[in-house]
């Protein structure tokens, strides 16, 4: 294992032969996790069928979802901030449906944070959230592209970038936790 880290721990007080009080110590040998040879066992991914994933995705949704025959610009799903609703095209395949609905759902979640809603920024953040959810739940995310990052990532202020990325992480976590609860039922 290499060399352990030695930690000195007090073992209590004792009285010496001359009447003075002393403190006894024990040396504890500990190892850093990087010094071990054990490998973490990867949890086998739990695969859910597409219907269960979609059901979990829309479990306790923040806004109503309506099906439509077509949407502008060939979109599969769209969050409309004025109507506070998500519109979804009929006839999509399950993987595309998950990706599109998760993105629209993330936009709806981001719009409800109370901050000023900017569709451009929210669209990129929702794209990131959708990618995270797809990776977590085993959906094919090979079509996702991050070649054009949002303007908020082009700033020199690391605190601003951290704040924006935290919002992406928190939104993904909220939706993921909701989905996990729905899938447990």
Name each model-derived stretch.
Residues 1-185:
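N-terminal accessory/interface modules of nucleic-acid-binding and processing proteins
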